[in-house]
Amino acid sequence: MIFDVLSIVSIGLLIGAEFSVSAFINPILSKLEPIAEARATSLFAQNLGRIMPFWYGINLLLMIVEGLIHRHDAGVSWIAVAPILWVITIAFTLLILVPTNNRIAAMNPNDYSDELKQEHAKWDMLHRCRVLTLSLAFVSLLIGIRV
């Protein structure tokens, strides 16, 4: 039971952080002057780019352990879906979103071109897809734990 709570809180916080980037942070940053927007976007990309890989990995491990803990429960199939979706999301992130994030993190604020701004807008749209997939994994885990 305590492990369930730890898993739910950790995964829920990660999804909340990812959602806040898409729903609040990036829309606010887009209203700044171009140099300020570029500087802030670069800082967010650098900081979150350092933290998120570990948080994603830890949450994947939490889901796998949840599957082991609940392996004899009726909801184990639901729990099994969660890490599968999580791994798909990690692969999508590594192959598509991370390279764009690295370019944004490394940019010079004075060189924030329209091309880079369009690339950031594309990243934002793909990030929303990631948040949706993470949310589906989370709901699957919650259903599995509850069943």
Feature map (PLM): residue ranges:
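Mid-bilayer segments of alpha-helical transmembrane spans in multi-pass integral membrane proteins
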Residues: 87-95
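Interfacial segments of alpha-helical transmembrane regions
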Residues: 1-12, 73-87
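Juxtamembrane boundary at the C-terminal end of a transmembrane helix
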Residues: 141-147
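Interfacial loop at the N-terminal end of multi-pass membrane proteins
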Residues: 2-6, 11-58, 102-121
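Core segments of transmembrane alpha-helices
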Residues: 55-66, 130-139
